[in-house]
Amino acid sequence: MSKSKTIVRTKFVDRACHWTVVICFFLVAVSGISFFFPTLQWLTETFGTPQMGRILHPFFGVLIFVVLMFMFVRFVHHNIPDKQDIPWVKGIVEVLKGNEHKVAKVGKYNAGQKMMFWTIMSMIFVLLVTGVIIWRPYFAHYFPIQVIRYALLIHATSAIILIHAILIHMYMAFWVKGSIKGMIEGKVSRRWAQKHHPRWYRDVERLEAKKESTEGMK
């Protein structure tokens, strides 16, 4: 039985969640930036009007949190740090040259992707908590003004960190050829998998061999 030239990298449900977050994050980030910079008030037109932007901003933020928590449950076991992350970090120069397969036996996600995962998840949690504290007219009146001021500062700082993290994530997705295709179509070439995630590719091969063996016994 000949092997397919491609393998499944990302299931449909995960791709749907990813692109839902992408769209919502764009709307939330754009509207959030406009709140802090009056000269960029026109950015709120993504929601129709400035008033609608202020109303919908937190609701879209909550939607992002819910979807990301669903993704957290699905991906956390792949993002636990392991000993293979150490040589990857130490060999970052070779990694940037495209030779990561020479420095570490990378699983489904490399050390950089794991750091990105935990950064995004931690920042979205902080943004939710601080966002609830400053959310008018529903929750802000339950907190003293000093708490709201600190929450605003932390919320803005976390948002800046998250926006930069997402920009890095986007750059790396374009930089590593084949990555975006995996998130759009859900599949990557065997060569891509073997080069960038050799340990994960071996696991996929083992599962394929086991499946073929089971089917052959029927």
Give the location of each predicted region.
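Membrane-embedded alpha-helical bundles that constitute the cytochrome b-like, heme-associated redox core
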Residues: M1-K218
